[in-house]
Amino acid sequence: MAWRRREASVGARGVLALALLALALCVPGARGRALEWFSAVVNIEYVDPQTNLTVWSVSESGRFGDSSPKEGAHGLVGVPWAPGGDLEGCAPDTRFFVPEPGGRGAAPWVALVARGGCTFKDKVLVAARRNASAVVLYNEERYGNITLPMSHAGTGNIVVIMISYPKGREILELVQKGIPVTMTIGVGTRHVQEFISGQSVVFVAIAFITMMIISLAWLIFYYIQRFLYTGSQIGSQSHRKETKKVIGQLLLHTVKHGEKGIDVDAENCAVCIENFKVKDIIRILPCKHIFHRICIDPWLLDHRTCPMCKLDVIKALGYWGEPGDVQEMPAPESPPGRDPAANLSLALPDDDGSDDSSPPSASPAESEPQCDPSFKGDAGENTALLEAGRSDSRHGGPIS
């Protein structure tokens, strides 16, 4: 389970990294550029010929051009003077009509031209050749009160602004009537507009779709693996439980000191390679091989066969398929007159030294074989201590 948790953690970090990448790309200005522009304050003033009153209005309704110096300008308003009524001021020889109050001459003036017909740069250069102090372009009628960015690189230090169509037509009509109109231009509010370029939008969309596909594929793979692993764990636990019940039918014997025991040619456990000691609990397989119980039970749970002769112990007990696929066989009954819990003994030397080697009597703690402690929990579950004795006509004592 640990490696699966690590795999899930790595996958989650990958998804998080992709999400952070997409968010970073979506931050305004991350892949695009910032647009900075300034609004213009437009102040117009004139004398109404009917009432002889001065009329003036101030509004922040203009917008400076991209290449225009952000500074103020002042002068009388002049409009293109052409026989055909060309108000766009595109022709190189365009002349401007500037009504002057009181017949004064050589006063600073501001060119008012309509948008269209040529580039912004051409309009500005034509007015600059006529010594205009500033150029005011009014937008087309279809845009209403909207002003748009203007690109006019290479026009020098002349002030260039754009005003809306209604505002431009209002001033134009006054000038065409011969009314002198004075315009004062001031610097308005600074605006910063950040945006993402079209290529960045496409890139972010592709990255997001890729992230979603990878995340979905990883989640599907993860949950399929988790489902399969959970199913195998449940099946394995059920199988081990049934196998423990079958192994519990094998006979158990307790080693006693000083008694002649069963006729088995074995002095030690083939699993832990330790000699059998007093009070050791051993298990005898159908093939007559003996092992420590805490050593052989975990082995049989995993392999089902005798470690020495490879006999299938489960089949030898009458289970031809998986332990859970057949019914349990009844445990063998003990012979009449015998206590089924009686201990059988293994041949060990007496204390008087009559045998070749006489190991000292071991305490219960010392006589326990040094098998893997992790096996003890599995080996102790569902284990039945079945002990039976048989009489030997020759010795009159316990035999194998």
UniProtKB/Swiss-Prot annotation:
It is found in: Membrane. Pathway: Protein modification; protein ubiquitination. Residues 325-400 are annotated as: Disordered. The modification Phosphoserine is found at S345. Residues 389-400 have a biased composition (Basic and acidic residues). The chain crosses the membrane at residues 201-221. Gene3D superfamilies: 3.50.30.30, Zinc/RING finger domain, C3HC4 (zinc finger). It is an enzyme of class 2 (transferase). Glycans are attached at N52, N145. It holds the Pfam family PA. Its main location: membrane. It is a single-pass membrane protein. One of its GO terms (molecular function) is zinc ion binding. Keywords: Glycoprotein, Membrane, Metal-binding, Phosphoprotein, Signal, Transferase, Transmembrane, Transmembrane helix, Ubl conjugation pathway, Zinc, Zinc-finger. One of its GO terms (cellular component) is Golgi apparatus. Disulfide bonds: none annotated. E3 ubiquitin-protein ligase. Ubiquitinates BRAF, inducing its proteasomal degradation. This is E3 ubiquitin-protein ligase RNF149. It comes from Homo sapiens. The lineage of its organism: Eukaryota, Metazoa, Chordata, Craniata, Vertebrata. The gene is RNF149.
